[in-house]
Amino acid sequence: MTKITVVGAGSWGTALAMVLADNGHDVRIWGNRSELMDEMNTKHENSRYLPGITLPSTIVAYSSLEEALVDVNTVLLVVPTKAYRDVLQEMKEIVTEPITWIHASKGIEPGTSKRISEVIEEEIPENLIKDVVVLSGPSHAEEVGLRQATTVTSAAKRMEAAEEVQDLFMNSYFRVYTNPDIVGVELGGALKNIIALAAGITDGLGLGDNAKAALMTRGLTEIARLGRKMGGNPLTFAGLTGMGDLIVTCTSVHSRNWRAGNMLGKGHSLEEVLESMGMVVEGVRTTKAAHELAEKMEVEMPITAALYDVLFNGNNVKDAVGSLMGRVRKHEVEAIPDLL
């Protein structure tokens, strides 16, 4: 039995805590809302982020990070990307032994454009790190909470570490594959949020299935193009953390990025969208980070650039569609050398 603390009591952190508890592990979860932690301990529900789901009674919730981390050998980080450094800086003052650091957040750090595993390795002293592992894939928290069949990927530089995390989570409804490509797995999970925002805009504008299919396909090309430039394996983007996550995030009403894009497509301002969502929309920050990376690394990402102009330069969504459709004609196969 592994002693594991889930850091972050949002919908995804709560759902993953359920998986771990179902597997018989000693599971604690930390959140900064004391009233929510009290509810999880007494009513076994997270009514704010995962309403209507009864949590295993063995999950113990803490509002004190120090108490939550006593004697643990594994932590699972599921917090917004912008909060990582603050949380990690607090954790490194508490942890005293090398432990496994798993993260299940899909985003790129604002300001630095770093992957989350890079942030962990920068902030946590080497003597406190046993392994850093990424857990990612097509996985809505609402469905995992209902114990519906879900498949994800565990990625680490050391394959034994990825397999250990695979064993932690795997059960009859939660299947886990392994992948040594930590760069590709992280980037696929983060960058698909950009395309999900654009897919929501497409649906909000009522552009139809043809346009959405083209957007998703060309969007995957952009993801793989940047991913390869950053050291990812192109084949990773055809797997669960690339195409798989892209499909589920671009087509489901559970996707907050799709919902945000849908509102933008229907004429709402970004400020109105973010205020109404009530939860983090990682795709907004990731669009900015990816656009900056693309310019720095000289990678062509026209969909990302068009969305960046909508979100941060006030461009009209219909004009953005027109600019993409009016680009210089090209051979589709021109993308292939970037992928192989």
From Swiss-Prot:
NCBIfam families: PRK00094.1-2, PRK00094.1-3, PRK00094.1-4. Catalyzes the reduction of the glycolytic intermediate dihydroxyacetone phosphate (DHAP) to sn-glycerol 3-phosphate (G3P), the key precursor for phospholipid synthesis. One of its GO terms (biological process) is glycerol-3-phosphate biosynthetic process. Its EC number is 1.1.1.94. Transmembrane segments: none annotated. Belongs to the NAD-dependent glycerol-3-phosphate dehydrogenase family. Sn-glycerol 3-phosphate binds at residues 106, 137, 139, 192, 245, 255-257. SUPFAM superfamilies: 6-phosphogluconate dehydrogenase C-terminal domain-like, NAD(P)-binding Rossmann-fold domains. Pfam families: NAD_Gly3P_dh_C (PF07479), NAD_Gly3P_dh_N (PF01210). The keyword Cytoplasm applies. Pathway: Membrane lipid metabolism; glycerophospholipid metabolism. It is an enzyme of class 1 (oxidoreductase). GO terms for cellular component: cytosol. It is found in: Cytoplasm. This is Glycerol-3-phosphate dehydrogenase [NAD(P)+]. GO terms for molecular function: glycerol-3-phosphate dehydrogenase [NAD(P)+] activity; NAD binding. NADPH binds at residues 11-12, 33, 106, 141, 256, 280, 282. The gene is gpsA. The active site is at 192 (proton acceptor). It comes from Bacillus cereus (strain G9842). The keyword Cytoplasm applies.
